[in-house]
């Protein structure tokens, strides 16, 4: 009989979400197995053991997850083959004997999502459902913390978002929700949660809040698709990546991310954090 471990396994511990979740679980005394590509970058947390296991290396993932009952899967970095990387990871997790996989997905994940990167999440969810493992899906909205990054050097947010609205969510709220699920995974088996902020905002409203927080003049300029492609051509990014960036805006314009839910509060016991509060200077 395979020996079971009390450890919870996490991917993405060197990133913004996985690192936050790992820290929260460590403070609760949960022993952790951190699946990373570079162990030197793994957070130094009590009870945490880093293990090298890239998503695409099924053998390494299977070995890293041996004996683990519960794992938290944060998606790999955006790549042309990300969906296949995810499927490889899921199959390896199931083969390793993982019983419950908690996956950080994306709001409205579907193979038909306008936001092209969300399609990878749909493929991943399908693989998890078919794996035989128990599962919980945490579908988050766009990160509130990233809104300042949409602003160009000229103080303009550009994109074909029209009058669409998006309920951006704080990374700390996502981490709180994920930690709550991982502390009692059985209570959330077979559940899908949509994690949003407390209000659906237009890009004009987002620009105003970012400007207020940064002390600079920020505005939003609605682009056509041709204008959006032209304004991003200088980055030298591959076509699939540029399409993903642009579809961030077209998905909002299509109304696919305007939903506001109470799932953050239901899981964490506290209300979702408004964008203005997320961007407020510390102290």
Per-segment meaning from a language model:
Residues 1-2, 280:
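Short hotspots in intrinsically disordered terminal tails
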Residues 49-52:
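Conserved SAM-binding strand-loop segment of SAM-dependent methyltransferases
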Residues 11, 74, 269:
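Residues lining the SAM
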Residues 2-45, 56-69, 77-87, 91-100, ...:
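Oxidoreductase cofactor-interface core, primarily capturing Rossmann-like NAD(P)-dependent enzymes
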Residues 226-283:
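A hydrophobic C-terminal alpha-helical subdomain
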């Amino acid at each position: 009989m395979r020996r079971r471990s009390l450890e919870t396994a996490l991917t993405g511990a060197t990133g913004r979400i996985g690192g936050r979740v790992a820290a929260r679980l460590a403070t609760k005394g949960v022993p952790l197995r951190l699946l990373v590509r570079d162990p030197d970058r793994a957070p130094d947390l009590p009870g945490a053991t880093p293990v090298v296991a890239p998503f695409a290396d099924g053998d390494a993932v299977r070995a890293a997850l041996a004996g683990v009952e519960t794992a938290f899967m944060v998606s790999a970095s955006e790549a042309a083959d990300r969906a296949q990387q995810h499927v490889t990871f899921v199959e390896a997790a199931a083969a390793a004997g993982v019983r419950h996989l908690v996956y950080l997905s994306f709001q409205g994940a579907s193979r038909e999502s306008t936001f092209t990167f969300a399609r990878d999440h749909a493929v991943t969810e399908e693989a998890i459902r078919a794996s035989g493992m128990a599962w919980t899906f945490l579908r988050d909205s766009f990160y509130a913390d990233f809104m300042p990054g949409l602003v160009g050097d000229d103080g303009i947010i550009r994109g074909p978002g029209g009058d669409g609205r998006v309920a951006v969510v704080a990374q700390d709220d996502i981490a709180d929700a994920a930690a709550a699920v991982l502390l009692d995974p059985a209570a959330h088996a077979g559940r899908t949660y949509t994690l949003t902020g407390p209000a659906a905002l237009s890009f004009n409203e987002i620009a105003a809040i970012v400007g207020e927080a940064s002390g600079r003049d920020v505005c939003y300029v609605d682009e056509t698709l041709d204008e959006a492609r032209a304004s991003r051509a200088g980055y030298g990014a591959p076509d699939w990546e540029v399409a993903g960036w642009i579809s961030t805006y077209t998905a909002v314009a299509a109304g696919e991310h305007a939903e506001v839910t109470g799932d953050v509060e239901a899981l964490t016991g506290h209300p979702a954090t408004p964008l203005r509060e997320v961007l407020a200077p510390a102290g």
